[in-house]
């Protein structure tokens, strides 16, 4: 497997748009007032969020060939100081893999190959926590400083039972992606995030069965690899 493929997966972490019913914003809900209230709810969620466990679904879309890959698994998340966060994803389908990001480093373990890719979460690889961090670990001040005024795209119901508001985030200045979209529930939790790259490829991540502030120990992010695992530095 080429390193670029590894970095692509490490940089992925985002999921599917299936079963999303969105309607335009109600006339009496339009304008900066509603967007401001959503940002305030997101800020409260960020402040109060000490940990997270959830199911995770990811869709990676290749715009050049019109193809997409789907991934399913479980995620744990532990915010830390600044924008860094500890993230672990245990993929179950289509193949079993574990990705852990903590203390500025990542490990991607592929049991079927008996191989682990390790490296620093800089450059494109920092997206691992960054995609989730669009809403989970970014402050109100950072949202206002780093993005154009947030655009309200609509409201709707995700998977039949989660009411969400749909926002578009366009970065100020130069960025590695064109824009991001987030779907925020009524408690200010971003339950779905989509990042569209400059070549129109996209990665969408969705959290399901979210458990806010569930017990998560810091040592859960330290992978205990078998002694015979081959490590490849990224």
Q: Language-model features: where?
A:
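Acidic/charged, solvent-exposed loop-and-adjacent secondary-structure segments enriched in E/D, K/R, S/T
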Residues: 107-138
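Boundary at the C-terminal end of the N-terminal hydrophobic targeting segment
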Residues: 21, 27-29
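Envelope-exposed proteins and targeting segments
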Residues: 50-52, 71-73, 85, 95-97, ...
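Gly/Pro-enriched, hydrophobic low-complexity segments
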Residues: 32-35, 117-119, 150-234
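N-terminal mature ectodomain segment of secretory-pathway/periplasmic proteins
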Residues: 37-40, 44-108
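Bacterial N-terminal signal peptides
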Residues: 10-19
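Beta-turn initiation residues at beta-strand->coil junctions
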Residues: 58, 109-112, 194-198
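Positively charged n-region of N-terminal signal peptides that target proteins for export
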Residues: 1-4
């Amino acid at each position: 497997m080429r390193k670029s493929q590894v970095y692509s997966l490490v940089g992925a972490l985002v999921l599917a748009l299936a079963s999303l019913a969105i309607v335009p914003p109600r006339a009496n809900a339009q304008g900066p007032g509603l967007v401001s209230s959503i940002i305030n709810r997101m800020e409260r969620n960020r402040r109060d969020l000490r940990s997270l466990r959830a199911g995770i679904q990811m869709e990676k879309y290749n715009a050049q060939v019109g193809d997409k890959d789907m991934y399913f698994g479980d995620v744990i998340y532990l915010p830390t100081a600044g924008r860094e966060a500890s993230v672990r994803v245990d993929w179950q389908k289509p193949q079993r893999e574990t990705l852990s990001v903590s203390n500025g480093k990542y490990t991607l373990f592929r049991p079927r190959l008996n191989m682990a890719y390790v490296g620093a979460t800089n450059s494109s690889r920092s997206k691992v926590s960054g995609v989730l961090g669009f809403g989970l670990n970014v402050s109100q001040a950072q949202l206002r400083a780093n993005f154009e005024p947030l655009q309200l795209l609509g409201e709707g119901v995700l998977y039949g039972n989660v009411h969400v508001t749909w926002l578009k985030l366009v970065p100020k200045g130069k960025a590695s992606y064109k824009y991001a979209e987030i779907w925020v529930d009524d408690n200010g939790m971003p339950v779905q995030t989509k990042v569209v790259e400059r070549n129109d490829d996209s990665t969408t991540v969705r959290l399901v069965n979210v458990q806010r502030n569930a017990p998560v120990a810091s040592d859960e992010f330290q992978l205990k690899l078998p002694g015979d695992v081959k490590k490849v530095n990224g």
